[in-house]
Amino acid sequence: MSVKIGEISYKERIDKGIDNDFMRQAVSSAQGRFRKGRLSQAEELGNWEDWRQLGSEIRTHTLENIDYYLHQLSEQVEKRGGNVFFAQTAEEANEYIENVVKKKQAKKVVKTKSMVTEEIGLNEALEKSGAEVVESDLGEWILQLDEDPPSHIVTPALHKNRQQIRETFADKRGYDKTDSPEELAAFAREQLRQDFLTADVGITGCNFAIAESGAITLVTNEGNAEMVTSLPDTQITVMGMERLVPTWEDMEVLVSLLTRAAVGQKLTSYITAYTGARLEEEIDGPDDYHLVIVDNGRSKILGTEFQSALHCIRCAACINVCPVYRHVGGHAYNSIYPGPIGAVLTPLLDGYDDHKELPYASSLCAACTEACPVKIPLHEQLIRHREIIVEKEKKSPVSEKIMMKGFAQWASNPAAYKLSTKVARTALKPWTKDEFVENGPGPLKGWTDVRDFPAPGKQSFRAWWSERAKGEKQNGNS
């Protein structure tokens, strides 16, 4: 399994994003709104940097002792009658879940929003085995109907407008009302209600698993998690192995950071906590509970210079300030995980072969690092990825290597440099208009296809300096 969402080339995805005016406007508007909310909530707290430091320390401590806390978590879950399965790979996770679904003879599975289940391709695996899978998060449900991957970690359907959503509902579910948000939401609620009531198995992700109690917490705004965790007889939680905290107090800190950093709220509408199978004295919840803990490449990141990437609490604060994401959108990253955190995490989970461009999808402005509520040094990790790509993986294009080698030889030869600056203006004259090079030749074409390149000056700095020095000397002698 792969975190990739398609086979279209990186350049084609970027071009498609840049040409999508609605998407760019929607992303820009959302980024501004989320950023304003985050800054407002940080100011209201008054000691935001102290909270960030505490969040970073909690994540660092947890990962440095992850074996202990995973063991504690599994003990607590099993103590309450749950089943725990450690999946080394996506295939192992999917196979285990498929077997549970088949054993229950389940025809319908209902899910909450979950990045890790998208990462391992769980929906596709279950559908191949004959089960109907229904996403219950509104954004994810829209995308599922339209067979479209998410473009944002928190707001997966950010790239769609309400007219497109209405068309999807009409084509796939016979919707015949207007595109007003209220009517669209009411229709989705009516449709999903039937799925909740008829589902045989409920599958959730996990925001934070609490090691000391075995509790699983879900942070949502729609209330769908309550339905998924209380109605089906069989419940399966799928979590990345890093998604745990030692105590309830640690969870409180990270949830406070998560909600403020993600959407600028003190709290989301719902924070759900559940602890496995239903006990005799309880009136709702599943009879059978399974916790699937997924590695899928994460253990290889532990103990490396990229370990802090696993601190991520999936708030998307880095995405909400990224200028590259603003212009190209989430699909350009060709990964379930877009934005700066995706550019760091995707090559670690899936290798450089298909994702060697991602570390370069950054201006290195460090806005992502500044926004991250758990202080992941994202821009530094992007630079390190670039070093590895060039020095170890040897993934740089041959043309780029030849070009850079030629540039080095040219720039280190004063005579060649001086001559080229003299002839450059004349050589580029056929492509120059109003002091800018348009539709330039050779290596300049990639640049000038999307923006104008300043034409060489009428006089080089070197010549100007020489004339200035001569003038001062003459004035001094007069």
Curated annotation (Swiss-Prot):
Residues bound to [4Fe-4S] cluster 1: 312, 315, 318, 372
GO BP: any one term: lactate metabolic process
InterPro entries: 4Fe4S_Fe-S-bd (IPR017896), 4Fe4S_Fe_S_CS (IPR017900), FTHF_cligase-like_sf (IPR024185), Helical_ferredxn (IPR009051), LUD_dom (IPR003741), LutB (IPR022825), LutB/LldF (IPR004452), LutB_C (IPR024569)
Amino acids binding [4Fe-4S] cluster 2: 322, 365, 368
Keywords carried by this UniProt record: 4Fe-4S, Electron transport, Iron, Iron-sulfur, Metal-binding, Repeat, Transport
Keyword Secreted recorded: no
Gene3D superfamilies associated with the record: Alpha-helical ferredoxin (1.10.1060.10), NagB/RpiA/CoA transferase-like (3.40.50.10420)
Primary role: Is involved in L-lactate degradation and allows cells to grow with lactate as the sole carbon source. Has probably a role as an electron transporter during oxidation of L-lactate.
Protein name as it appears in the record: Lactate utilization protein B
Organism: Oceanobacillus iheyensis (strain DSM 14371 / CIP 107618 / JCM 11309 / KCTC 3954 / HTE831)
Annotated gene: lutB
